[in-house]
Amino acid sequence: MGGEEGGGDPAVLVDDEIELPDGSRVIVYGRRSDPELYPSGYKYRFQYLGPDDTALLRYDNGDTPYANGERHDRHYMDEYEEIEFAGDVRSHLDRFQQEVNRIYHERN
């Protein structure tokens, strides 16, 4: 993954999309955010989509903040679980990429 920086917006840490040889796609976005809205200080969404755009894996911290703090979610196929945030967007993205690699090799 190229990890493309967010152009001219210094708050954007990563904004990238790549297509893998089997036609699946990885789309990642992460930015600094107001810690009052997202206590981690980041808003992110990492997605791995199959060739037919079926959601295979997604990490995110929701579209809206939660009253009791922030929730970090992992969606794998039809499964959902809360996960621990790795501490910063780059480390969390590394964890996601490792999982994408594993799933990709299992499927191909």
Regions found by a protein language model. Name each.
Residues 74:
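Single, function-defining residue in the core of a domain
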Residues 78-108:
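Well-ordered alpha/beta subsegment
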